[in-house]
Design a protein with these regions (language model features):
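Conserved, structured core segments of small domains
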Residues: 1-110
Length: 110
């Protein structure tokens, strides 16, 4: 089963990983890559660089900025493969420790 691990950052904190965090993230990535659990991972731009397109029905809207105004935002993600929730949750704990940020876990819909 696939899971999204969203890396949660705070606008008032450091968004980019420091040298030690990057080393820990690289080590975690190597571990899950070797185990065949890493599908992909990436850091993403801050919400001020987001653009929302809404062309549903008769709408014709392009808005700069994110859809949610919050101090918390997704700063990166992993997509991982795990046999069951307990394995994914254990990996999420490791990911959180590696990047020194909270991780929100969501399973993919089947």
């Amino acid at each position: 089963m696939r899971y999204l691990f969203a890396v949660i950052a705070n606008r008032t904190g450091e968004v980019l990983a420091d040298h030690d965090e990057m080393a820990a993230i690289d080590s975690f990535n190597e571990k899950i890559e070797a185990a065949g659990q890493r599908i992909m991972a990436a850091g993403i731009a801050t919400p001020d660089q987001a653009v929302v397109f809404d062309f549903r029905g008769t709408r014709d809207s392009i808005t700069h900025g994110t859809v949610v105004d919050s101090d918390l935002f997704m700063a990166g993600f992993w997509i991982i493969e795990a046999e069951k929730d307990t394995v994914a949750h254990a990996l999420a704990a490791e990911a959180s420790k590696a990047c020194n940020r909270p991780i929100e876990v969501r399973p993919f819909l089947r």
